[in-house]
Amino acid sequence: MIRKVKPQIRVLGFDDGTFSFSSKLKHEKTILIGVVMKGSLEVVGVLSRWITVDGRDVTDAMINSVNSSRFKDLRVILLKGITYAGFNVVDLERLHNETGLPVVVVVRKKPDILAMEDALRKHFRDAEERIALLRKTPPLVELVPDKLYFQTVGLDEKTAAEVIKVTTRTGFIPEPLRLAHMIASAVMTGESKRE
């Protein structure tokens, strides 16, 4: 339990690398990068796993990454959305339960869940299982009007908002997520992309 959010709180932010939507490759992989930071200022470490584009392995990859790492003083997991590598959907409750860490999901735009459900039904045999994961996520909370939203599992909304503020250095996205995005894109394309 987090009583007070300190400026040096240890957080882990995950983001994925690029991949090709038009690829005919089955089981195409992309990188999942986790950046461990003290607040928004000091990078403590980087974790990586490979995940399957449109697969079902992102939750396992995150759990394995956290539980097998040397970083035992993590306090919060930050995610940039709940879908990675296309429609590889994170099971937020399972991630929280199996790591023992609260999870805070940060997004810049409200996702169109109905459009996501339609796309899943059109392209996936296991669409209903993926849709069930989307539907069981907590409601979005607006932090910055029309610019930043979050949802949280295992942490109250006030504390989650404070974690986001403490870990954000510039702009709206927490620094661990911004750096994870840059590292993941550099691994996959040879050069980092802007957040």
Curated annotation (Swiss-Prot):
Top-rank taxon, per record: Archaea
Matches recorded under InterPro entries: Endo_dU
Family named by the database record: Belongs to the UPF0215 family.
Protein name: UPF0215 protein TK2033
